[in-house]
Amino acid sequence: MADSGNWEGRCSGWFNVEAIVERKTGDAIPADENYDGDDTEDSEMGDFIDNAHISNIYSQQEIAQALYHSQQVNADNEAIRVLKRKFAGSAGSSPDSKRHELKHKQRSPHILTIRDTNTTSTHLLCEEQDSGYGNTEVETYERQVPGPGGCLQSTSSSNNGSQMASPGETNSGSSSISNMDIDMESTPITDITNILKSSNVKATLLAKFKEVYGLSYMELVRPYKSDKTQCQDWVCAVFGVAPSLAESLKSLLTQYCLYIHLQCLTCSWGIIVLLLARFKCNKNRLTVQKLLHGLLNVTQEYMLIEPPRLRSTPCALYWYRTSLSNISETVGEVPEWIKRQTVVQHSLEDCQFDLSQMVQWAFDNDITNDCEIAYKYALLASEDSNAAAFLKSNAQAKYVKDCGTMCRHYKAAERKQMTMSQWITHRCDLIDDGGNWKHIVQFLRYQQVEFVPFLIALKQFLKGIPKQNCIVIYGPPDTGKSHFGMSLMQFMQGVVISYVNSNSHFWLSPLADAKMALLDDATPACWTYIDRYLRNALDGNPMCLDRKHKHLLQIKCPPLLITSNTNPKADDTWKYLHSRMKVFTFSNPFPFDSNGNPLYQLTNENWKAFFTKTWSKLDLTEDDDKENDGDTVQTFKCVSGRNPRTV
């Protein structure tokens, strides 16, 4: 320290510093006092004081607090993780719901196994009545854990993951984690039983259904493997339905169903609902599950949904007899598959399959393809008893093949016995009115084709006069040649032959049963083939036709229309064909409107109007007594008359 002499010289300064230290904060400093904020000497005196150990103490305390805080955070996170793992599959909103489940064990023990993870379904059967005070912030529950020596001890836990520690316990993070893991050391017997029961939920539900209803659920249904397969009728068994919802289910389903058959029986699980429903439209299993889940508040895992057995008489009798008893409620008209197997009149209508009825149906509807016959006739099973008998038969493929063969034979014979005038009249009767014949005439004029010469050629063409039996339409591409020819073939129901099949001996076999034919896009190679082998066909004289697996057939070639980009009369190579055909030239591109539609509509209705308008010009015969005597062609009938069956 400084000597005493120096201190005596600065005696007043010493007191000033001491006065400043004792003055209260905020007091004004007199102006006559000399105060310097940077007291260098005082700072020099401070260097004599060693305060390093005080800083070390403070830093150690801060490190300890940070370590303690991190340990507490880790312990809290671990406690929350354990609680989440324990209560992840709980159906209640808090651990207190376990006490409610044990309380209602006798009424619905399935709640111990059924865990609904949907948080929105909070109004289940075991919901506790609200006391009016609301739920407490911290909900605790007691559970028994094995203590030392195998004794059971009661522990308390809260929903925030904290443990109630004893006075002797410490607050370290490791002890908290060990306390939270105690619940994993024991597995009650009831949990093991629930796991065994829930390992096959469907088997458990089927066993309970058979115990309650006295019959197997699978005896009433035919299982669908896919959840996307659609059906109109469904048999649903729903487990654990609330009584109030079970009573109102019939009224809730009325807006979705045409027929409802509802049964409700009570067991130890609650109410089991058995439902036979015919919906207004086809639905798949997933759609029905979502509908019932929304109406009954039952998870989809505890529903059995399958379509019913439609051809089982015992199943039909079960639904019919239970509908008459007081254990079921029905709404709507009974499905026809139940009536057919239970009502006397419907039973009498079941008969053996008659092939003649199937052939008559195919002939009347002009169906000759085997695939169309099989599909469309099967659709009539719900309306036609013979179609239902067809579906029950084990020889459906044979019946379809025989029906198609006979129908084609009958159609071919019908065409052969008709003249060209009768055939055109027959085709016109099948087409609606309302056509405009001017479209065809205007299109011919647009292509610079004289209408009168074309009409004369068409008259001779339809009559099949020798040397006038073939019409050729020649022109550049995209002039509407094929469109004109195809529209005429569609109206006349003619056939189309293709030169691409000329390597086969049977490529001309469609001409055997045709009233008119079209050879589209004849190339020079095709004209060479016609010049070599088909001169008689163009003449309209009889020719010999080879058919597959059949003897040779002698026929007169039907009127043949040919379209080509090559003019056969311009080449002397085919000079022998010049006198056998009538050539018309289409020189202008086919016209379209601004929307891309054809400007001239060559439809069946317009062709009907064209033939009706030019009937006399084409020299087609007309039946004068048609109104009095009816059609000259007899109506085909292959089904013999029979007396109605009476009871």
Curated annotation (Swiss-Prot):
One of its GO terms (biological process) is DNA replication. PROSITE patterns: SF3_HELICASE_1. SUPFAM superfamilies: Origin of replication-binding domain, RBD-like, P-loop containing nucleoside triphosphate hydrolases. Phosphorylated. Its EC number is 5.6.2.4. It catalyses: Couples ATP hydrolysis with the unwinding of duplex DNA by translocating in the 3'-5' direction; ATP + H2O = ADP + phosphate + H(+). Residues 184-350 are annotated as: DNA-binding region. ATP binds at G475, P476, P477, D478, T479, G480, K481, S482. Residues 449-599 form the SF3 helicase domain. It is found in: Host nucleus. Keywords: ATP-binding, DNA replication, DNA-binding, Early protein, Helicase, Host nucleus, Hydrolase, Isomerase, Isopeptide bond, Nucleotide-binding, Phosphoprotein, Ubl conjugation. Residues 152-179, 631-647 have a biased composition (Polar residues). Residues 89-116, 141-180, 622-647 are annotated as: Disordered. It is an enzyme of class 5 (isomerase). A motif (Nuclear localization signal) lies at residues 84-86. The modification Phosphoserine is found at S90, S94, S108, S121. There is a cross-link at K556 (Glycyl lysine isopeptide (Lys-Gly) (interchain with G-Cter in SUMO)). Can form hexamers. Interacts with E2 protein; this interaction increases E1 DNA binding specificity. Interacts with host DNA polymerase subunit POLA2. Interacts with host single stranded DNA-binding protein RPA1. Interacts with host TOP1; this interaction stimulates the enzymatic activity of TOP1. ATP-dependent DNA 3'-5' helicase required for initiation of viral DNA replication. It forms a complex with the viral E2 protein. The E1-E2 complex binds to the replication origin which contains binding sites for both proteins. During the initial step, a dimer of E1 interacts with a dimer of protein E2 leading to a complex that binds the viral origin of replication with high specificity. Then, a second dimer of E1 displaces the E2 dimer in an ATP-dependent manner to form the E1 tetramer. Belongs to the papillomaviridae E1 protein family. This is Replication protein E1. It comes from Human papillomavirus type 34. The lineage of its organism: Viruses, Monodnaviria, Shotokuvirae, Cossaviricota, Papovaviricetes.
